[in-house]
Amino acid sequence: MSVTRRQALQIGGVGIIGAFGLAVPLTSVNAKSASQLASRNMPKPYQRTLPIPEVLKPKSTVVDPDGHKRHLYQIQQKAALANIVPGLSTPILGYNGTFPGPTIKVNQGERITLEMDNVLPLFHPQWGYRLDTSTHLHGSASLPQFDGYANDLTGRDYCKDYEYPNFQPARTLWYHDHAVHNTGQSVYSGLAAQYHLHDEVEGSILPQGKFDVPLTVSDAMFAANGSLGYNDNTHSGLWGDVILVNGAPWPVMKVQRRIYRFRILNASIARSYRFSLSTGDAMTIVATDGGLMPAAQQVTSWRHGGAERYEVLIDFSKYPVGKRVELRNLSNKNNVDYDFTNRVMAFDVTDEPVDTSGPGARVLPTLLAPSTTMSLKASESVKTRRMRVKRDNDVWTIGGMTWDEVVQSGYRKVLADPDLNDVEIWEIENSSGGWFHPVHIHLVDFQILSRNGQAPLAHERGPKDVVYVGEGETVRLLMKFEHHRGRYMIHCHNLPHEDHDMMAQFSVGLDTNDVDPNHPVEAVRPHPISQAAPAQGTAEVQPPQTSTRPTEVAAPVTTTPVAAQPAPAPVPAAVPAGQKDVVAITTSRHRLRKDMTFSGTSKYAGSTAATSATVVLYDVTPGRASTRLGTVKANSLGAWTFTAKPGPTKQVTVVKAQSNLGGTVTTSVRTS
């Protein structure tokens, strides 16, 4: 039997047992190390050059029926080996096999379709969970069926075509995996990358090209063999002892004596940062998650939670040639810190001739651009909603709701139901003393009205889609629910919190019994990679899919593809040759002497045979013989649910689902 996700957590991933594995609130912890690397393999600060991810080019362009062009992109999610620590290779999951994945750059109004191919192993090579994926373009007002809904899963050898209209103002977005209950481990394994949306306004006032630099910051711990270690401290969070920027430990970047623009993404799955310069000088924040701020903000440090993006200008003209300026991490009280987690990367000022062409080379801007989000007034709100984020019986909740409740309701239960174009105030309270929660609201940009009754901090006075809700803090947010009707998620972006089960949903412009044409799971289904979906328009040009990157910077972290492991043999069934079911479990719960519920999906190739899929459930709890629990048929959409009251008299802790059309999956069972 394969190792289940929760079993992997119990043994600390790949042999790394956390010293702080109690579910108690954190204040601040300092420790020597988390990794088990030999000293010769432990990376040291400032030994590597900053890698810059490749820029992905479209594989073709078509013309939509209305005459607008649409660029078609393709990415493969695949396993690879990365050169991160000295002398050893690290297995990763990556978009096109790189860590982080390629950057996508588009102009406002350019439509794209992104074909996301899942060619990952069937199960995670280290942690044993099934590698079904769901891709979320974080920061995009996408239709629900293209938003990366947690249960909109794409199995191995399948793909999904995501449509992005890119009508919003310029901003730094990122795309990452959002698969239910496994987002943290998949993002930690490498499924994350930046996505830049440009427009004429930012293009005329901010540095561009090689002076517009993505910095994807994350942290990790490593086993002795160089593989990633994973310990989420009883679902509280993971804090590694190695800081990575664009996949490299504590890198160095050579800079000219001019202004640079840095797009800083916190891609850590739990760690927060408080960035500052070693010189103590101020930096200029010009954009937040949702784009340009109304006015630039000068700060010497700022608090940066998971998934937040800040665009920061640093003026290196004030420093002499040969000066090293370090980007430091002053940290926050909710972290576990180690010897070198106070360092992030370094900039070395060179005597290279200064390129002053293009905007923003010499003058720091003050006034930037108004936005509809920041122009909203609290008086426009038609409703105020209040919700708390907290831990309850070892499960993280938001507004008193868990994601399991959403699934159990058939995706109907919602935390809020604003009408289309409604303006509302959401008040989010975190009364805990030791956990912070970076709360992400899909679809919308919002304005932070207040934090504990005071004005928002200087660095967050721009349009946001993630809000840092610190210990003992209450924030008030103002937002307009526009663009699309449908269901969208709200969750904590401390990903172990999200995975255990701090996620809910809201609906926009839907009544309870409405037929939803934009259903996030049912409207657009994945299809086999070999059966590509037809293009929407007519072919115009088909350039080769190449990548570009500035020659002045280092290549991305070296990766080597790893062959996907073979799928398990299908059970005997009358199935057309070459076709096989992909069965997934999305909910598994057995409350002893109360009830038992399992639900999931059947993704039989082509989906037309979904109604012929029958799923058999087995109790495979370790220490006793396997027992058949029951049988359930998938519906026409491939969904299935099995319930029993009160259920078996012995606690089920591990369950296996097996399809008569081939394919099995094993997972742990929630007992509360």
Identify the meaning behind each predicted range.
Residues 10, 18, 22-74, 78, ...:
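Extended terminal and domain-junction accessory segments
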Residues 1-16:
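N-terminal secretory signal peptides and thylakoid transit peptides that target proteins
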Residues 142-153, 221-369, 456:
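Histidine- and aromatic-rich segments of cupredoxin/plastocyanin-like copper-binding domains
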Residues 168-169, 318-321, 483-484, 645-651:
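Surface-exposed, short loops/turns at beta-strand junctions within beta-sandwich domains
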Residues 108-111, 256-259, 421-423, 591-598:
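Short coil/turn motif common to extracellular beta-sandwich-like domains
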Residues 71-198, 205, 271-304, 324-337, ...:
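Histidine- and aromatic-enriched segments that form or immediately flank copper-ligand environments
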Residues 161-164, 311-315, 476-479, 639-646:
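Exposed aromatic-hydrophobic patches
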Residues 578-672:
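Ser/Thr-rich low-complexity repeats and stalk/linker segments
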